[in-house]
Amino acid sequence: MNCKKIIICIALGMAGFAANLSATEPATAIKSHKAVDAAAPNVYWTDANGQVSYNINAKTAPVVKIALNLFENDMKGVTGYAAKQKTTAPIQIFQLDLLSNKEFSSLEKLGAPVQKIITTKDAYFIGVRKKKLIVVGSNARGTAYAILELSKMAGVSPWSDWYDLKPQPRKSIFTPVDQQWIGIPRIEFRGLALNGSKWMNPQNYSRIARLMLRLKCNTLWQVAGKHDATYNKAVVDSFDICIADNYRVTEWTGKKHKKKHRKTLENVKMVCDNAEMPIENVAPGLVLDMLNNRDYLETKSERREKSHRHEAHNDEDCAWIANVTNPKKAPLQLAMMSDLAWNPYALKAGIRNYLQSWLNNLFGSIAGKKIQPLMEEYYRLTSIRQPAYMAMPYGDTEFHSGEFGNELERFLYNYDLLKTKTVNIEKTLPANQRDGFFEIVKYPIFSAALIAEKELEAQEARDIARPGLFQKDDEAKAAAAVSLSAYNTLKQLNAYYLRLGKGKWSNFITINGAEMQAPQLPGTLSANEIKRLKGEAFDRDQDLQPLVNFTKPIIAKNAYDYTSYTKAPAPKGQAAQEIELKPLLGHSNKAVKLPKGASLRYKFASSQIGDARFTLAVIPSYLSNAKNMRVSVSIDNAQPVVCQMKEDTSSKDGKFSIWRGQVLKSFYVTLLDGYHTIVIKALDDNVIIDQWALDFDVDREYYVFPVLK
């Protein structure tokens, strides 16, 4: 029996160990390895000229060659020289399933822990052995992932190509001899379900496939009646991508990649599985909750009882699929999903810290620290109203210019402040980061702001104008002028993006969506009228008064501003479930998830007397299998009022709730002045409280809860 066969037999005998390892260890674990040669603390990838070199086994799969090409170009961006292949190179790469006996023997002599990855698909090892950086993949994809992991270690973000980001130049690159990384996927099938992508051509599919490769995703998903994508076979084959059709995954296996292997999946987590809510229209905090919540598992047979899921489900046979229309619009959400699919501890420090680290990797720590507040405010404002939902098919939004000193203009003013901060930070960035900053930060912020201004000012013009008298109503015309000016600026912004990189993103920039169309106005204006009337419009800098001036008869709070809380009852022999704060989720940008039986308590004083309307806002439930999402509210120890917050997402009310990102329920109470208490309790699982308001003007209509900061 030859050496290679002996090792494989030993590895197969340790398959159980390897499976347990993938479930318990971080997927990309950094481990200490005792140095053999204390005089050589680092292994340098670069030679005296700064050029990186590598060597690889003789036979490799097409996807490995693609990864090597990307790596070579990545190193050119970092060092100024493309990486080159060299027999004596400091980086030695091995694709396990295509090694010759001689190559396998050489690898064995280097002491790499092959047994930890050999039986696991897509796994890899990177570490120093005998003064060489050893890179080993269990199969073609694992080898490709490991190669591109080297790019990440050198400072090249997986998103660099997609956002035209230049890595920081380095004269040398090295790895300490005591470091090693073992990557074992936690989720076997990880990928995308592309919606509305019939416009995609092979070149664009190739770009998406490259992104998937860098994110270590391996599956494109299609379910009849849900996803209309038709995938390009040549691209799929060359990138070794699995195709899933109606819960059956097909992949090519074997040394010559000619054997079809089909697997039926019972447990699948469809992230944002709704045609009207692709992942780019969902707050990062909610995406994270979906990823961490087993109740979002979907089964082929529709057997979704919890007992079935907990008994049958394990991560290794599960697929995570993100429903996405345009990957360029959801980089943070997709990055979170891909990282968690490999490492269950990837967001252990919290989503805000993850966002900070993600931005640091893109722009450097100094710029990243400045950009983070911009993105957090962007996620807050878009959680109040996503740009895609600004153009209303069922009439106007509920924004009301007559309440709280004009809440409509106050909302737009927050965008004005955000735009100003964005421009100021842009000026501080080096030229090689400007394009990436525009694509990741400035364009999302400015387009969201301009869409909001276009639609809300048009709504204001329609509300003000009397039938047939638009041309005689200067106030209505001024609002229309602001709307049209925003529309013209939006077109210029899109045109700039379409020209970026010689037009390489022209097919990815959506300029024909409802939110991009001309505003619906009660009349027309000439260019000269737009310019003149815009100067007569509501001046947000001068005309807006402090919100506190308008909130005497209303108490509004974010859910996280509680006085105290009560944990859920503890199951026998287990610890009580804690409440969870959910940053980057909700109008509050920090909603509170309550386990069943947990409650929040608020204490406050009010000088108001009489009837009041209490309104509770929770995050909509997207769980099709959940029948109830009940919350009880008790004011001043009165009999609790039970509110059913679960809605049919296909109903008109359900759509309104999705568009505003909140389900609202109200009831009336009569109160005296003095101190009051409110207790909000979850009666079912998956209850996420966002805000509440107690309004003594019971007929008031408004959209944004007037929470004082």
Regions found by a protein language model. Give the residues of each.
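Sec-dependent signal peptide recognition
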Residues: 2-9
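Aromatic-lined carbohydrate-binding surfaces of glycoside hydrolases
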Residues: 52, 57-60, 64, 79-81, ...
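Contiguous, structured surface segment used for ligand recognition
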Residues: 23-183
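Bacterial N-terminal signal peptides
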Residues: 9-16
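Extracytoplasmic
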Residues: 139, 521, 525-709
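Substrate-binding groove of N-acetylhexosamine-processing glycoside hydrolases
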Residues: 178, 266, 280, 298-571, ...
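Intrinsic-disorder/low-complexity accessory segments
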Residues: 92-155, 207, 215, 480-534
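Beta-sheet entry/capping signal
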Residues: 90-93, 132-134, 189-191, 218-220, ...
